[in-house]
Amino acid sequence: MPIRSTTAALLLAATAAAGLTAAAALPASASTSPAGYYKLLIRVATDAPVMCLQPADPAGGAGTAVVQQPCAAVQAQNWAPLSISGTSYRFLNQASGLCMDVAGGAASGTPADQWPCNSISNERWSWPHSFPDSFWPIRSQVAGSTSYCLDVPGASTQAGLGVQIYRCNNTAAQAWAIAGPVT
């Protein structure tokens, strides 16, 4: 089966399991954010489970790690892409009301966490594709650099593992799907 067909089948199965509906792709533009909340999905290998991002403690505050967990129909796994400009977004968590953030400077291994939404580069992410779409890197814009991508350490399938930024390397550990919108 071609890669795109496999990808489409995977997204359809994951969105159904997580309580999402299929939606037409919306073009990303400088002035428009896609409406609603979406799931940020990762699958590090063809035989690996699909995982979704959420705060480690959905009731946790600023500084709570962003981790991968099995996808479920819970608000903690819902993220609204908020347009900044062009292909730059902040990802706002529905349960916490906080944005996905890089906990420090631009260096491989820097953990992702959540923080009150603001205009600093630690919360800027590049997604130059339509919503929903599948299996592309989400690039951090911390410190003005786009050399670091959202990454699952060691391409692990461990539930509860914190995600990080890591130098972009075109591996499955950095291939994200954005599925939704959530209903």
Language model regions located:
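Extracellular glycan-recognition/adhesion modules and their associated mucin-like linkers
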Residues: 31-61, 78-106, 124-156, 175-183
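Short, tandemly repeated low-complexity microdomains enriched for cysteine and small residues
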Residues: 60-80, 107-120, 124-126, 157-171
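Secretory targeting and sorting signals
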Residues: 1-30
